[in-house]
Amino acid sequence: MTREISLGYVPLVDAAPLIIADVLGFAEEQGLRLRLERAANWSMLRDMLDQGQVAAAQMLSVMPVARALGLGSGGSKLETPMLLSLGGQMVGVSAPVGAGLERAGHDFGFSDAAAAVQAVAALGQPLRVGVPFAHSMQALLLGDWLAGLPSGMVELRTVAPPLMPEALAEGELDAFCVGEPWGSQAVVSAGARLLLPGTAIRPAMPEKVLALRGGWCEAQPDLAGRLVRALSRAGGWLSNPRNAATAAEIVTRPSRVDVAAELVERALLGRIVTDRAGSEHVV
């Protein structure tokens, strides 16, 4: 008998296992029908899970830890039966800050975190830095990377990933750390310059997990196991570079991840264009 499971996600490249499991039949092979529910931001997705609107969700890896420590809003304990992604974050700056770095001689090498933060510090200007959520790997990475800057120089602002490019274009942010494809989209639509992948600050950091309400796995172990297997097989399919173009086309269909398929394909292949001049770096 086919069982339906509702899954919540925020439109990012690492929502791909959920989308691919649904579209290409990996869920069906496990006797599941997935009902995917898109959320505009992480607060909304958290609330959807807490209120039972979805049974499971793609989630920032730090959010269940913060919940267990009593940080942020209340709610039930969260279970995380599997990791969905490692890394995938991009650190970038607005067009004006990028121009200042270029005038100062920064090489935009996209790999040296120490050189990049020294260049940013040398500008000597306050920075409004966008992160997708207060309790996120992005916020932790930035805290590590920017730790040596003078007190008060950095103001972290929470901005939903799909809104990060718009916030840069409107002059509301000077820098950001966000998951793909929104760093690449910021290059396209806001003239941002990408400085580093998150892995240049800390390699192999857990980025997204599959989250379920506390007790769900224990109450329905067979169903939880089938869901994990479906997503794992979708992840295996996604790991094959030959599938990147097909995956990108599926993930960017209407009402899923609203960017050009080319940006998602580049992210899946680890080939990131870091400026409007077309500079490409492999991560």
Task: Identify the residue ranges that each predicted region occupies.
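Short, glycine-/small- and polar/acidic-enriched structural segments
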Residues: R3-P150, D174, V178-P181, G191-G198, ...
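General small-molecule cofactor/ligand-binding pocket signal
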Residues: R35-E37, E155-V159
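Short acidic loop-to-helix transition motifs that present clustered carboxylates
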Residues: N41-W42, V159-P162
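A bilobed periplasmic-binding-protein/Venus flytrap-type ligand-binding module shared by bacterial periplasmic
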Residues: Q89-E102, P206-L223, W237
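Inter-helical turn/loop segments and adjacent helix faces that build the functional surface
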Residues: L149-V154, E218-R226
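Loop-centered beta-sheet repeat module
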Residues: P162-R213, C217, A224
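Secondary-structure end/capping motifs
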Residues: P221-V283
